Amino acid sequence: MRGAYYVLAALLVVASSQIAAEFGHQLPVYDDGIMAARNAVVKTLPKRYLRGGHDVHDDSANEERSLYSVLVSLINEGVMKLPRATEELNMMPRAADDVEVMFRPAEVNEEMPHITKEELKKASKSAKEALKKLWKPASRTAADGHASHDIPTGEKLYLDLEAWDIKEFHMRGGSVIKKHRSMIASVHQEFLNLCDPNLHPTAAETSLLWGMFHWKPELCTIEIHGRNLMRLAKRDVQKGVLKITSNELLDNQWNQLSDTHKLSVQNCLLNLYYQRWVRMYNIFKRNRPDLIAAPLNLELNLGTSSALALRKHSQVPSNAASTSNVKSSVITKRSKRTFDSNTGTISLSSKQAKMQSSKSVVPLLTGATTSGEHVVPMQNLKLSLGGPSGGFAPYEPPKAHSLKSLTPASTALTLEDSETKLSLGGIYDKRTDKAPSVP
């Protein structure tokens, strides 16, 4: 720092002398720090140095030389880098041209086709629906139907004490669902053939799994089905604990266990029951035994009312006539009557029409009749009016009047097959309070 101080002082002196020379002034001359005065005794004083600088007398000179050498080296280094800097300056225009040639995002977007808002909304909606679908990795049983969408069997469940306090006894499971009772036998047998012998599902369990696939579409997901299977497994565990508490000896042993031990036992049983339910669910989902027995499942395919009517009519044979002794009923399966007016065809229901008689049998009218004295009890004739299977019979000219003789009770009544075909529906006469009489 001392060398720099001296350099600055010298520069100031030179600058001040130049300024004084320009204005015609002359600076006083100093000699070793003593200014000559008039009539003064001149006495030289010893040289003074800065603090700590009297040991080395040429320290300032050395610092000045070192500063000069540093400046020279910096100047030389800068001069050596000038050619390289010049080359870089010359290359800058070419680099700018290359940058202009490069594609910018704005230019790329301008070349893209325009997409309307409706198309964008449609694409976004489709993407959201696709993300909602859960695609599980295919397992080693991927060759069997939809095994890739099965509920994983390696999941471990754990419930705390608060969750076990919630009872699941309100869940269905003790009996078959009402709408499955007519078909549960065939579906259960088919399900038994598909399952392993160690699973051995019951009819009630088959009905539960069957019903899960008839839930609302928004509820038929793997997550919701998995939670329902967990609740079923929890209910099975709670039913087992209830049986233990009903036995006094087992109840005492169970109460002696700590809460932690009880929790471990319940969770272990929960996973065992859950794995069983998951295996049965996956088998039922892949094979759908309820669809294998679909031809017999009329209630689920046609509705309850239509299925019952179709089943009842299908049980009626083509030839229907039976006889009995006196004071017995004559059961007629099918009959056909034709009137002379545009009344179409009257068809009896498939239920057995029982006509009671004490001494003789009520005459069965099979021919075309227009008048007569014998009256058929209308309360025994159950007509199926209208319905989806009803139809309009074309007009036919009246046929010749004929009446078959009355048959005694001991004689069998036979009906012609050609006139006993089953006819569902028809147009009937409005006046049904009185049957046509026989001439």
UniProtKB/Swiss-Prot annotation:
Statement: the UniProt record of this protein carries the keyword Signal: yes
Keyword ATP-binding set for record: no
Major localisation: secreted
Record localization: Secreted; Host nucleus
A single GO cellular-component term on record: host cell nucleus
Signal peptide residues on this chain, from the entry's feature table: 1-21
Membrane-spanning intervals of the chain: none
UniProt short sequence motif RxLR-dEER, positions renumbered to this chain: 48-65
The entry's keywords: Host nucleus, Secreted, Signal, Virulence
Role summary: Secreted effector that acts as an elicitor that induces cell death in host plant cells.
Similarity remark: Belongs to the RxLR effector family.
Entry's free-text remark on domains: The RxLR-dEER motif acts to carry the protein into the host cell cytoplasm through binding to cell surface phosphatidylinositol-3-phosphate.
Name assigned to this protein: Secreted RxLR effector protein 117
Species annotation: Plasmopara viticola (Downy mildew of grapevine)
Encoding gene per record: RXLR117
